């Protein structure tokens, strides 16, 4: 009988061996996968938080190192001064200031006034006669005087000048000259006084609109040069903005009543002392 291959069904021990080999392969693959995976980051320790101290609050009432500069204003009302206040005053002006000398009743101070004087002629024209008969400028005469306060009023004779630039230039030059000659003196610019309604209606260059424009120049120059400015005009201005007829001879120059109002205003608007000085002294005594 020729030989034949006979197939036999595998035994159970071969099946068990195959199963064990498959299980081992799966376990090895799982181990490789686990080794390739990155390890989890270890938990970080919590860092302490630094708390900055709060900035200290500065009380509002603590004064600053540099005091704020007080705004410039015209001379304010103060307690009335007696006439000795005017002992060291030099009054500088034109015919209006000469009228004040004659009709105010003030018998103190020294007067340097020339009829027709202007801010230009005060420095450029030798129209002041000295005691020994020499002719010098008004500015030179004031320079030689011993005074602690200079009260200046000029401008009525310049109202016909073109615009205000020429007036401003000469007025500033005069103020600088007075300051240079008397560096320790109080320079007080007095406002120009208004004219009457009758004079204002004439159509002349001597009118209240021009006077207001010149007063604006004086006020600006006083601030720029560090001088005082006394608004005399408000003492002799009526509700219509004009000089009351009962205060003037001719609508331009003041009579006795007008000069008294002028002097009273000067007495209650003094310079060289705080406006509240009298009240503070009285409070300290009481």
Regions found by a protein language model. Give the residues of each.
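N-terminal Sec-pathway targeting helices
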Residues: 3-20
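Hydrophobic alpha-helical membrane-insertion segments, chiefly the h-region
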Residues: 22-32
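N-terminal, intrinsically disordered, polar/charged segments of Gram-positive cell-envelope systems
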Residues: 33-88, 286
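Conserved SGNH/GDSL esterase-like catalytic core that processes O-acyl groups on lipids
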Residues: 79-170
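Alpha/beta-hydrolase-fold catalytic nucleophile elbow
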Residues: 153, 190-191
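Charged helix-capping and loop-helix junction motifs
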Residues: 165-174, 211-214
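A short helix->loop->beta-strand "cap" motif at the edges of active sites that frequently abuts
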Residues: 182-186
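Catalytic His-Asp segment of secreted/periplasmic serine-dependent ester chemistry enzymes
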Residues: 195-286
């Amino acid at each position: 009988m020729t030989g034949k291959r006979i197939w036999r069904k595998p035994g159970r021990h071969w099946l068990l061996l195959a199963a064990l080999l498959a299980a081992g392969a799966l376990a090895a693959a799982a181990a490789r996968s686990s080794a390739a995976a990155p390890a989890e980051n270890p938990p970080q320790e919590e860092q302490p938080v630094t708390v900055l101290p709060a900035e200290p609050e500065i009380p509002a009432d603590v004064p600053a190192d540099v005091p704020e500069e007080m705004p410039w204003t015209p001379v304010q009302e103060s307690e009335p001064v007696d006439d000795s206040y005017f002992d060291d005053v030099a009054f500088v002006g034109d015919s209006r200031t000469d009228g004040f000398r004659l009709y105010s009743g003030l018998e103190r101070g020294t007067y340097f006034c020339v009829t027709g004087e202007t801010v230009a002629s005060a420095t450029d024209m030798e129209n002041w006669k000295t005691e020994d008969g020499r002719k010098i400028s008004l500015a030179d005469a004031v320079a030689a005087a011993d005074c602690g306060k200079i009260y200046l009023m000029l401008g009525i004779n310049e109202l016909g000048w073109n615009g205000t630039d020429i007036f401003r230039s000469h007025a500033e030059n005069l103020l600088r000259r007075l300051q240079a000659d008397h560096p320790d003196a109080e320079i007080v610019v007095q406002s120009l006084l208004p004219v009457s309604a009758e004079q204002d209606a004439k159509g002349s260059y001597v009118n209240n609109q021009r006077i207001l424009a010149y007063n604006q120049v004086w006020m600006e120059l006083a601030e720029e040069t560090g001088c005082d400015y006394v608004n005399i005009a408000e003492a002799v201005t009526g509700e219509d903005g004009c000089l009351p007829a009962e205060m003037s001879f001719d609508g331009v120059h003041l009579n006795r009543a007008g000069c008294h109002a002028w002097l009273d205003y000067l007495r209650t608007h003094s310079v060289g002392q705080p406006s509240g000085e009298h009240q503070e002294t009285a409070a300290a005594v009481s």
